Each structure stands twice: as C-alpha cells, then as structure tokens.
UniProtKB/Swiss-Prot annotation:
Disordered: annotated segments: 103-146, 576-609
Compositional bias of kind Acidic residues: 104-137
Gene Ontology, cellular component aspect: Cul2-RING ubiquitin ligase complex
Pfam family, one: Kelch_KLHDC2_KLHL20_DRC7
The protein, known as: Kelch domain-containing protein 10 homolog
Quaternary assembly: Interacts with Elongin-C; may be the substrate recognition component of an E3 ubiquitin ligase complex.
GO terms under biological process: positive regulation of stress-activated MAPK cascade
Domain of life: Eukaryota
Function: Activates the Pk92B/DASK1-MAPK signaling cascade.
Keywords: Kelch repeat, Repeat
Kelch-type repeats, residues: 214-277, 279-334, 335-381, 389-437, 458-508, 510-554
C-alpha cells in the first residue's frame, strides 16, 4: 500500500489552494486576526467609526492611506501585556511565518521549473506644451519610527510586527483591511513620508523601469522647473535618477548632475531598460526638443542595487544609428536592438543592434515603406518581445497615429517584417462609439509585458492620445501575443486621461504607472502620482510579503538578523533598502538625503528651519 508523504500532501494542498479566492479570503481573515485590537477606548472607537463611514470601497482607484500620527501626542513606551495575550499573538505571528515559509518553499520549487523570458521595454516621451504644474509642499510627517538613538532595537518578533494597544487601535481605525485585488489600480501614498524635494516633482517625458525591489525614474520635463533651471544656468530637463523602494514606499535621489559628472542632458524621450540589474539608456533629446538629439548609450550604477553610484557613457563603434528620440529598445541575447524614432523632422522604423560584448553597432534593416511592405516611420510607439519577434505597437508622427489592429513585428531570425492581425474583445465593442473591440489608435501611451502562469506573453497598455491632440485615453488593455487577442480591463481605469507618462513592471507581476500629463476639463497638468496594478495572481509568498509591507512600511529600521529570525525569507529582506538609523533630533531631515536641484528652495528651507 502506498502511503502519501505528509510533506508532499502539504505541497499539493497549498498548490491547489493558492489560486483560489477561498484561500485569499482566508489569508485576509488571518491577517485581520493578527492585527485585532483587544481593547478599544470610547474615543478610539468613535474615531474608527468615523473613518469607516467615510471609506468608499466602490472606486476603481483605491488609495492605501497610511496611518497618521496624532498631533501633539508624545511617543509612549509599549505597555505591559498579559502573558497569555502575548503568547497568543506570538503564536499567531509564528503561524503566519510558517505559512510564508511553506509558500516560499513552493515558490522555489516552481522557480526551478520556470524559464521566464520577461523583457520590460521602456523608452522616453516628449512634448512641447507649456502647461504648469502645482508644486507639492507636503510637510514632513514625523512618525513613531523617530525614537531616541540610544534606544536599543528589540529583536523580538512581537516588537517587529506588533505595537501597543493604542497604536493597534489607531491602525484598525485608519487603515483599511488588506485585500489582494488583481487587475485593480491602486494609488501609492508616499508624500507623507518625505519633505518637499524628497520625491520627484511632476514631470512628463521621463522613463521608468523596475527591479524586484525598486522602481527607477530617469529624466523628464516640467516647464515650471525648466524656467527655474534656466535662471540658474542648469539643464532645462530633470537631470536626475530617482529610486522608489516598494517595501518602504520611499523615494531616494540616486544620481544627479551634482554627484555624477557624466549625467546626460538628452533626458526626454529616451529609452530605458534593465539588464543584469544595471540600467541602460539610449537616445533622447534635450530642450528645445529636437534641437539636440543623442544616439549614445549610458550605464547607471545605483546604491540601491548595491553598486558604487555613477554614470558611464559606453564607448562604441561601427555603424551607429541616427541621433534621435522616441525609439523602442529590446535586449535579445547579447544584443541591444533599437527600432524607430525621430530627429524632430524625419521619422524612421529602421532596426539597429549593439553587441554588448564588443560595443559594435550594426544596421540590420532599413525600412523602405515606399518600396516594399515595411512599417512607416514613427516615434512614441511601444515595443514588446516574445523571443522571436519584436512587436511595434501604435506610435505616430506629429500629426498622425497608427492603429493597434494590424501589428508589424520584426522577425529576429529571418531579418524581415511580419504582420499579425489581432482579434477584438467583443465585450468592449461599442457601435455608437465607433469601437469594434480594439483599442483606438494612439501614441504617447505606456506599455509593459509580463509572462503569465501559462507561459503566454501579455502586453498591457495604458492611456495615450490621438494625433489631433483632441482625444485622450484613460483605458487599460491587454494583448496576448500568442493568441493575438485583445482584452479590455473592465475592473481598472486611470482616474483621468493620461499621456506622456511611463510604466514598468516587476518580475512578480505588478505594473506601476508614474507621472505624465493629466487631461481634465480642457486643462492639462503634469503629475507625479504613482499607481500600481497586479497583472496576475502572483505566488502566495508574494501576496504575504505585500500584506506585511502594507501594515509595516518601516521594516528598514530593523537589522536583517531580526527579520530573518522573525521568519521572513532572505530573498524578501534583500528587497529592503539599507537599515536606517533612528535619529535623535526628529526636527532635522536626514543629512544623507539628496535634495533635488529642481525643488523649491524657499519651501524646502521653511520646512527644515
């Protein structure tokens, strides 16, 4: 008689449950029990009821509000609790950790079988309009993280994840219960954790890219900041590279003209990608747009990635591409491919590639649409890649756009262009609106690609505009590159039409959208809002980590040994930034913080005096 191994049985059960909504509800209920409040005062109960009455759960755009500190209330030491209560909570935490460990074990087994070929392709955008963006002046918000420097960190799991009854009551009343919701757009709240100048200002024309732990934003443009930079003789574009840590929801200025001598000046409508945890940019334009273009490649090293910060311009030779902006780039094997772009006057769809081993450029295809069936020249298109073809989505010229129904794709093996007819989403068809189930032709939109659990490559596009600058989009669509089928995401939509923004995705299947120009009531304003959307149901351990960081955005205050002893797997603790030291004087900002050259100096001084 064959007896089922208990360990194998556990793996089978978890594998069957991880993709079910029942188990997701179990996780949410379990987390709620962990953070339950045993004693709530009358004032706290009234505050909780008031907050719950004002909570709107029907919006597609949900804001994860962070708990606010009560003004004027001094920090209190953790009160003594009954041993029974402490033991119960400790057991609850240990159970959650064991669940996360089991999920991590399952994930590691799956990772050995998976051979993901995710390639995130990002490139720049540009615009020549002169709208002005309001400068944010959020005050620095002190939190309970700011304790005396001499206070020793507790290594107990209870002190890492559990707080006093008062703090738990505030958490229960001010933070909605965590709920994992795929294909829902969520606004990331980060401003209350920074002083003015401690996060990127509103911008367009920037590019973002993501690793497992950080989001990176390079360059961009804002006319208001450009005027200030002009008066001081600085670059009129944002000559800076920012990083955003997903776990702590904090921004950090990694590089700028002050600490990186080789920082490029063509930082609008460039292309940005990540390869072996190194950022690579190509092309771009300075300001005024089209007057100064680039065909250089730059490599960026950041402290967030554990490297010595710096920027290097690659030394290349061979048949270099034309200096232009608005191309799309893909890394295939050891080659960097670039397709399309514009000098400001001429538009191309030529294909070049750079051998990253030798630094030699090679022209592999010159498009001649007037002579053969080649795609017409364009910029502000997006490119996605399935290992055999590079698909070119949309894009256009200064007055035209290209459709998303018949898609040109460069064949990497045959060195030619193929065309693929796509299939519509019949649910999204609207005869009155002229929509036949396809996304409308557009440019200046964003696109990321992700490999689903079935192995299919899926491309997600958001926002954009048409060539006449009169129609703007806030919709989100998905294209399956295997079936060539379009699907409109019905559960998520941008809060307002958005263009000249940028998007990126992390390997766990989460998409991020940052910045851009917002169109509302015939007014256009640049933004620095950050949104996230899970494109798929990730691994169970990823959901557990997302829930932990939702309730605890200060894990970087604890040393890694404490977190490992609490049961958090090493691959998650490695996503945290370097451990912060608790500062003695909470009225002064961190001296190691780099302040953006484009911040408002008067507002920055007033908030730190």
């Amino acid at each position: 008689m064959n007896i089922l191994n208990p360990g194998k049985f556990k793996c089978i059960v978890f594998d069957q449950l991880r993709h079910t909504w029942t188990f997701l509800l179990f996780i949410c209920d379990f987390l709620a029990k962990i953070y339950r409040t045993p004693r709530i005062t009358a004032h706290q109960e009234q505050l909780a009821n008031h907050n719950n009455n004002n909570n709107n759960n029907n919006d597609l755009i949900m804001e994860q509000d962070m708990p606010e500190e009560e003004v004027g209330q001094p920090e209190e030491a953790l009160p003594q609790q009954d041993n029974g209560e402490v033991v119960d909570r400790f057991n609850a935490i240990q159970a959650a950790v064991e669940l996360m460990d089991a999920a991590s074990d399952l994930d590691e087994e799956e990772e050995e079988e998976d051979d993901d070929v995710d390639v995130d392709v990002d490139y720049g955008d540009t615009d020549s309009e002169s709208e002005f963006e309001e400068m944010y002046s959020d005050e620095w918000t002190s939190s309970s993280d700011e304790l005396d420097e001499g206070t020793e960190l507790s290594k107990s799991v209870l002190n890492v994840f559990l707080s006093s009854d008062k703090q738990q009551s505030q958490m229960a009343g001010q933070i909605p219960m965590y709920a994992f919701q795929p294909l829902r757009l969520v606004k990331c709240q980060y401003r209350d954790k920074h002083i003015p100048g401690g996060f990127p200002l509103a911008r367009s024309g920037h590019r973002i890219i993501a690793s497992n732990s950080h989001l990176y934003s390079l360059g961009g443009y804002n006319p208001r900041s450009a005027m200030s930079a002009s008066r001081h003789g600085r670059c009129l574009l944002f000559q800076e590279l920012w990083s955003y840590n997903f776990a702590t929801r904090t921004w950090r200025l990694e590089l700028n003209a002050g600490n990186a001598a080789n920082m490029p000046v063509e930082l609008a409508s460039n292309a940005l990608t990540i390869h072996n945890n190194v950022l690579i940019s190509h092309g771009g334009t300075g300001y005024p747009f089209g007057v100064s273009c680039s065909n250089d490649c730059y490599v960026y090293r950041t402290a967030s990635a554990g490297a010595t910060p710096g920027v290097d311009r690659l030394q290349v030779k061979g048949d270099l591409p034309t200096a232009q902006y608005g191309p799309g780039i893909v890394i295939h094997k050891h080659f960097l491919y670039t397709i399309g772009g514009t000098t400001g006057f001429d538009y191309t769809c030529d294909v070049y590639r750079l051998d990253l081993r030798t630094g030699i450029w090679e022209n592999v295809y010159i498009s001649r649409p007037e002579m053969r069936d080649d795609p017409e020249g364009r910029y502000r298109h997006e490119v996605v890649y399935d290992g055999k073809h590079i698909f070119v989505l949309g894009g256009g010229t200064s007055h035209s756009v290209y459709d998303l129904q018949r898609i040109p794709a460069y064949n990497l093996e045959a060195n030619c262009w193929d065309y693929f007819e796509t299939y519509p989403d019949q649910r999204a068809a609207d005869a009155d609106d002229g929509n036949r189930g396809y996304p409308k032709p557009r440019k200046c939109f964003s696109c990321v690609q992700h490999q689903s659990s079935t192995g299919d490559i899926e491309a997600f596009i958001t926002g954009g505009l048409q060539g006449d600058f009169s129609t703007y989009f806030s919709d989100i669509w998905k294209l399956n590159l295997r079936t060539k089928h379009w699907y409109r995401i019905e559960t998520a939509i941008l809060p307002r039409p958005l263009y000249f923004h940028s998007a990126a995705h992390s390997d766990n299947g989460c998409m991020y959208v940052f910045g851009g120009i917002e169109y509302i009531d015939k007014e256009m304003r640049r933004r620095n809002d950050l949104y996230k959307m899970w494109m798929t149901v990730p691994k169970l351990s990823e959901m557990c980590w997302d829930a932990i960081t939702y309730y605890n955005d200060n894990l970087d205050l604890y040393d890694r040994k404490t977190l490992l002893e609490a049961g958090i797997p090493k691959r998650f603790t490695e996503r945290l930034p370097p451990q912060r030291r608790r500062r003695l004087d909470t009225s002064q900002p961190d001296p190691s913080m780099l302040i953006s050259l484009y911040s408002n100096p008067k507002r920055a001084r007033s908030s730190t005096q």
